[in-house]
Regions:
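Basic, glycine/lysine-rich polyanion-binding surfaces/domains
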Residues: 1-120
Length: 120
């Protein structure tokens, strides 16, 4: 990994790493109370690069995704998001995810290891 990577930066800040879905991610910095204060009273950087992410493009993206999930995506404005379950044709849950609406795309954000279930 290059010295300017996020991993290197977080290491310099005292991050203790662990494995998530085959990736090394910061799990803590050794002081839970200080971490909580930083998150609630200041600003914090949280590395979510290990999560699955999929961009949905095309003119029918909103209609298509709206028919695949349990929440109302069509009502979202650009910059808004919602939590939803992705279901199959028999309404069986395939994954839980967040859907974010941007001007020209929808972003699906889901737990690691679920890409196959989401793209099925």
């Amino acid at each position: 990994m290059p010295d300017d990577s996020l991993h290197h930066y977080l290491s310099q800040q005292g991050a203790q790493f662990g494995g998530v879905a085959g990736e090394q991610v910061a799990q803590n910095y050794g002081d839970t109370n200080a971490e909580h204060r930083a998150l609630t009273e200041s600003v914090a950087l949280v590395d979510l690069s290990f999560r699955g992410c999929l961009a949905v493009l095309g003119d029918d993206r909103v209609k298509f995704i709206n028919g695949q999930v349990t929440n109302e995506v069509a009502g979202l404005k650009s910059g808004q998001g919602c939590y939803a379950a992705l279901v199959n044709a028999k309404a069986k849950m395939q994954a839980d995810l967040h859907v974010y609406r941007l001007d020209d795309e929808l972003i699906l954000d889901f737990e690691p290891g679920l890409l196959e279930a989401v793209t099925e």
